[in-house]
């Protein structure tokens, strides 16, 4: 499964000089949690909601540009990357999104931890369900061996008693 099959292709971006208050307002009005920061058609960083919340607490001015608070050197994937690789990058780097780049290193999409969860949830939901309750199946499977062991135990205990 490739990232290109599941990524969001229409990506809202901001520039490094976008004031953090504007980025915060835009994030909340659109319901996003991350923005790629793009300059000259290349991703130069990622800003997350938590970065903006920390900035709001630590900076006195809402005009501080996001390049002062963003995470530089973003972790990215290509559109041909395997989905499991993208998921591993998210987990290993403790991040919530990955900008998706084409072969020219230009932004073509984004994949988020929410996208990955939706894919996993869809796979789990698509699994066939048992036609019989699991308890009955398990009980039936162990019934005969347990009876055998119980009979042997009874025989041994009666031999010892005699």
Q: Which stretches of residues belong to each language-model region?
A:
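Bateman (tandem CBS) regulatory domains
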Residues: 1-11, 62-74
């Amino acid at each position: 499964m490739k990232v290109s099959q599941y990524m969001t292709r229409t990506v809202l971006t901001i520039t490094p000089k976008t004031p953090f208050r504007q980025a915060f307002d835009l994030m909340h009005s659109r319901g996003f949690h991350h923005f790629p920061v793009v300059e000259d058609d290349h991703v130069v960083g990622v800003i997350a909601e938590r970065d903006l919340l920390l900035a709001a607490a630590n900076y006195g001015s809402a005009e501080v540009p996001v390049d002062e608070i963003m995470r530089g050197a973003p972790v990215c994937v290509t559109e041909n990357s395997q989905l499991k690789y993208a998921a591993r990058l998210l987990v290993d780097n403790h991040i919530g999104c990955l900008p998706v780049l084409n072969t020219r290193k230009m932004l073509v999409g984004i994949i988020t931890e929410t996208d990955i969860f939706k894919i996993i949830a869809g796979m789990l939901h698509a699994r066939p369900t048992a036609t019989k309750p699991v308890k009955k199946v398990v009980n039936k499977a162990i019934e005969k061996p347990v009876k055998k062991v119980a009979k042997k135990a009874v025989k041994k205990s009666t031999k010892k008693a005699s």
